[in-house]
Every structure is written in C-alpha cells, then in structure tokens.
A protein has these predicted regions:
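ATP-binding glycine-rich loop module of kinase domains
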Residues: 27-83
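Short beta-strand micro-motifs within the conserved protein kinase catalytic domain, predominantly
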Residues: 103-112
Length: 281
C-alpha cells in the first residue's frame, strides 16, 4: 500500500532502498525518498524468534495479571499480542481517516512499515526549553492527550517520547503498536494513557531540571489534562490507581526510597502527583 501511488520517483526510491536493505536487522531508519522524509520500521524474523515469542507471551500474561491486581481489569493476553507492524499500520490508517494527527502510512508490508517523519520528540524539546518553556510544553502535551481522548481514542503508548512536534508546531502522536485500546475498557485505557504520560516525565533522563522542578512538571501535566478533559469516568479510574499506589507506598515506600534508578523514583513521583492532584476526591 502506498499513498504516493502517483509519485513515480518516490516509489522507485522506496523500492530501491528496500531491495538494498532487504537483509537489514530489526530496527528503525530515518530516510528521505524523493524529497519526502520518512521513518522506516523493520522486523526481521530469526531462528530464535519462536523462543522470543514464547518469552513475550509469558511476559504479557504476567502483565495481564498485574493489571488485574493494580487496576481491577485483566486484559486478554491474545489481544495485547496484536502488536506487529501490520497491526500498527491498520491503527494508523483508521486514526488518520478519523482526522487524528498521526503519521501518514506511505507503505506497509508484513515486515516493513514506512511512515512520514513527524518532527522532533517532546523530551528533546523539554530538555532544551527554559523553565517557563517547560511548563508550556507540559500544558501542550496535556491538551493534546485530552483532545485525543475526547475524540474517543486510546494511544496505548502515550509516553512523551511518542509525541512529536514539527517545525511548524504541529503535534503528532506516533508508535501505535500496543493494543491497549481494545484490551481494556475505554475509561481505564485512557487513564492508563495518562499514567504513561506522567510516568514518562517522572522518569525522563536529563540533568537540566532538579527534583522539585520534575515534580512540578508532573503535576502540571496531570492538572492540565484533568482541566482539559474532566471526564468523571477517567478521573474515577485515576483515583482507583492512586489508591493502589498509596497502599504500595505505605508498606514499601521506605524500601523504594532507598533503591536508586529511574523506574523506582519515577513511581514515587507519579504516586505523589496523583495524590496531590486528586486529593479533593
């Protein structure tokens, strides 16, 4: 499939590149075809792919039960595993047809997906911005996710790294491999998107901002989202998640604070953000 069917130069350049790189390993490449900046995602099966698939299924089963323990819903592992390049291409086409700001799909095949280049990732912009500029970026990211949710959609990969901004200021959501939207109820899936967004800010690498600013940026993200999308069902799911986090922090907080690492410390930031933003409930 190609939306550049009438662009012979684009098709020729793409075909030549795919032929030249037919044996390339799994990965992502940034390539320009006939003046069009593109992102090429490739998947190459290997002899040990069945083993990887088995480990992946085991991981998904564990995550499914963990989701049930923390959020009250157990998503189907089979649905969560609908996350190959073809699945992503189909989701992107549906979202694009519905008017969402997602990359155009130039071409897709079982092991190849070619998308339009969407711009610079949000984490880079956050690191380069002034403190005031970062607050503005938090408001922008929160508003973009709120708009996406109000339209009835779920991202499933709502980390800040998957929000791109082009030179003209257009924001585009990328990376729709995960099938969270079909595996969970809509309110919980959207609440999970919010959690991913805030958690990604909590764990964002960078020496440009200190602990207090990081916590403030997390709070700005959540407050901005709740102000732009005051959906009571999504809020109720966030409150439920906060209660589970509070229990974990109550009994294990003393231990977690002593463990270094972005993931653990990010959990504490998110727990504090949810508590402070939802404390009026």
């Amino acid at each position: 499939m190609s939306t550049h069917a009438d662009d012979a130069r684009f098709k020729l350049a793409l075909e030549q590149w795919l032929l030249l790189h037919a044996d390339d390993p799994t990965g992502v490449s940034f390539v320009e075809f006939a003046g069009h900046s593109c992102v090429v995602k490739r998947y190459r099966a290997k002899w040990f792919s069945p083993l990887i698939a088995g480990l992946k299924f085991a991981k998904v089963v564990v995550l499914s039960w963990l989701c049930w323990l923390l959020m009250g819903e157990r998503p189907s592992p089979q649905r969560l595993l609908k996350n190959n390049l073809q699945d992503e291409a189909q989701r992107l086409v549906r979202l694009k047809d519905a008017g969402s700001s997602v990359p155009k799909v130039w071409y897709h095949a079982p092991e190849v997906l070619v998308l339009e280049y969407a711009g610079q990732d949000m984490p880079y912009l956050i690191r380069m911005a002034t403190p005031e500029g970062r607050l503005g970026l938090m408001s922008r990211a929160a508003q973009e996710l709120a708009n996406f949710h109000r339209a009835g959609f779920v991202h499933g990969g709502a980390q800040l790294r998957n929000l791109m901004v082009s030179d003209d200021g257009t924001a585009t959501r990328i990376d729709f491999e995960e099938n969270i939207g079909e595996a969970l109820s809509l309110p919980l899936a959207q609440a999970y998107d919010v959690f991913q967004m805030v958690s990604s800010m909590a764990g964002l690498r960078g020496h440009e901002f200190g602990l207090n600013e990081r916590q403030m940026l997390c709070h700005q993200l959540l407050a901005g989202y709740l102000g732009a999308n005051p959906d009571p069902m999504v809020r109720a799911q966030l409150i439920s998640i906060e209660k589970h986090f509070a229990v974990i922090k109550k009994y294990l907080g003393w231990c977690l604070k002593s463990i270094p690492g972005r993931d653990i410390q990010g959990f504490l930031y998110v727990a504090n953000t949810l508590r402070l933003s939802l404390c009026d409930e």
